Amino acid sequence: MNKMNISSFICVGGILTTLAVIFQSAPVFLPAIGLFLSPLSTLPIAIAAISNIPLGIIVFFSWILILTIINIQESIILLFTTGLLGIIIGTLLFRKGIIISILSSSITPYLGTIFLTYIIGIPAFVNLASSFSTALTFFIFFLFSLIYANICNIFLKKFINYLTKLKKIS
């Protein structure tokens, strides 16, 4: 965990929170394009957690508070899926290795999606789940979570390695 002074902590946290809110709320303001930007909302929180775990947690909660003002449904989805995914990836990727990070981070959105579907009843998830049997729905959610977590972990690892190389060059 990197030590940060308070000014850097606040500035970096604010920038990453802003990026995460923009990406997560993109489907609200740009319905077609926003669906492609929304998955990128995991990356700012993961970057914050890689840099400093308390920073990742602060960004996570400030992200939820700001997003609640914009759209409560997006905030709930964030709380149980992409937000926790970012925290898990950021905490484990460079501390425990990519395999542990992929396995742990794929469980989080899987359980979150099941919770959003069967406990909270988010309409988009309920409509999808009603089209299939429960076992098939669970399998689809797990497969999607595993693929999504895998892509996020690999992309983030390559991105951080690229930034590290840039820092060494300059």
Describe each PLM feature range.
Residues 13, 80-121:
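Short helix-perturbing small/polar motifs within transmembrane alpha-helices
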Residues 1, 5, 9, 74, ...:
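Membrane-helix interfacial "entry" motifs
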Residues 20-25, 64-70, 107-116:
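Aromatic-anchored segments of alpha-helical transmembrane domains
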Residues 33-90:
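Alpha-helical membrane segments and adjacent membrane-interface helices in multi-pass membrane proteins
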Residues 2-50, 55-58:
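Hydrophobic transmembrane alpha-helices
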Residues 24, 28, 49, 67, ...:
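Membrane-water interface at transmembrane helix exits
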Residues 101-170:
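Membrane-embedded alpha-helical hairpins and interfacial helices in multi-pass inner-membrane proteins
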Residues 10-15, 35, 57-61, 76-80, ...:
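Hydrophobic alpha-helical transmembrane segments
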